[in-house]
């Protein structure tokens, strides 16, 4: 009998859970707010938005095709303020952090591959394991 990933006797499944205010959560909230803003004005938009952050800096990037003008910096600062990062002496503040935006239109290839029945053409969750 061959052993599979799921039948391995030494299988250890782990996951990470972060709490409110963690940079991963803040970045997710910024991306969600950007999507909400766009879809609220342009339901036919195509959005692939990624957000990352470090001390004093937020970077918004991706491929977004929409007819709606988006104030990416304003949305990011509002989310950061709403989360509670309001004092620069704490290492991060909505007023003093840098916000870099690098967004371009979605590529024609991805846009052509995504139809009304399929909302995402290049998204997935990967699960793997190491072996010798």
Residue ranges and their predicted role:
Residues 2-132:
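A domain-level signal for the structural core that forms small-molecule/cofactor-binding pockets
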